[in-house]
Every structure is written in C-alpha cells, then in structure tokens.
Amino acid sequence: GTPEFISDEANIAHDAKYTVFDGRKLGKWHYTAVNYIYLCGILSKLEHKSYEKLFRETYIKPLKLKQTEFLWSSMTKLKSAGWVPGYERSSGQFMRVDHDQAVKDAHNELGAGSIVMSNADLAKTIEYILHGKLLTKESRKVLFKGKAPSYYNGGFYNLKKYKVANGAGEGYYTFLRTTKGAKDMIIIQDNHTAHGEFGKIKKKVNRIMSIMLHFN
C-alpha cells in the first residue's frame, strides 16, 4: 500500500505498480495477501461499492453479527464489538501493538487481514459460507477443492477430513478447523503472540481436531 493510507483504490494501484511476474514461480502454489487485495478491487469495481460496504451487506447485516468490525472503525465501535488490542512478546515481555500502525497494516491487507471478529461470530460466518445459502452446492464443490501439495483454495486448506484456516499479525493469532459442513468446529484466537509460537500452536490445534474427529 501507499506510505500513508489514502484509499483502497490508491493501495491497489500502488500494489499493481510493484507486482512483478516471476517465471520461476509459474504453476507453483504460494500464498500471498495481494491476491485477495486484487479480488477486493475487482469486486468493488463490479458492484460499484467498497469492500467494507460489500462485507457489511453480505455478512454483518444478514447474520446480525454484533462482535465483528473493521480494525479501522472508530474506537467506540471497536469496543462495542468487544475488541481487544494485540500484544507481541519482545525482550521477555508483551508489548501492546501500536493501533495506528495496525490500522495501516489492515488497510494494506484488504480482504486478508482487515476484520476483528469474536469466536461466535466467526463460527456463524463459516457455517453460513460452508452450509448456508450464500453459495450453491456446485459453487462450494469448485471453490473448496484445492490441489496438492497445500490443497488451498477459497480461503481454506481443504484437507481430507477437515478444513483449515490460520491467521497471524498485529499481535493476534487465529486458528480455525472445521468439518466440511461446519458441524464440528474448533476456533482458537489469542491477542498475545510470540516469535516461534505460531507453528507450535498450529500443530497442537491440528492434533486436537484429529482426536475430536476420531471419537466423533
């Protein structure tokens, strides 16, 4: 994004200017937030609405989500939604992440890291996406079927027995595991993060999900 936030459109134009083609990566899977940023730009252009407006109309309003907000919303709205600041471990102690910097990063991660949401709201949204009327069965079959080695598509790592989604940044961790129809789900979020802990927690959550499904 631009050094100082101007608009979503300016950020997308800035990203496009600095996006280059690397032939060595052609045909190889690699996650990058810029794909979601471009998708947000395409949707906004097609619908003539901002990504925020589209998100509110698609999820927040119809699902009556009370604990979901954009990180750049007013502090009043954030606190009303139950928002808590993120902390990162540095030199042996947890330091609060600067909110202004977190907001700038949220703008730069449009569509990939802009939302703060409670476990309950996240579960409700995931159930709506995987089992509700938002998508047709045919659309879900296409969207949630990734290719090896990661099986990533539609925002999930689509494993054989369950789906995986993770998030990290600005002092937050999110780990989500769900069965295909969102009947069984694990959601763990934390606002205290430390270098090297993400991978360890991710493996433990995967293990818990496997055990849960084994006894289900």
Regions found by a protein language model. Name each.
Residues 168, 189-190:
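Short clusters of small/polar residues that mark proteolytic maturation junctions
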Residues 1-162, 166-168:
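Short, surface-exposed loop or secondary-structure junction motifs
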Residues 172-181:
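Short, surface-exposed beta-strand/loop micro-motifs that present aromatic residues
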Residues 66-67, 181-184:
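Loop/turn elements at helix/coil->beta-strand transitions in domains of secreted/extracellular proteins
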Residues 106, 192-194:
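A short acidic/small-residue loop/turn micro-motif
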Residues 194-216:
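Short, gly/Ser/Thr-rich active-site loops of penicillin-recognizing serine hydrolases
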Residues 163-164, 183-185:
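Hydrophobic residues embedded in beta-strands of well-ordered beta-sheets
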Residues 177, 185-189:
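Structural recognition of the beta-strand scaffold that forms the well-ordered cores
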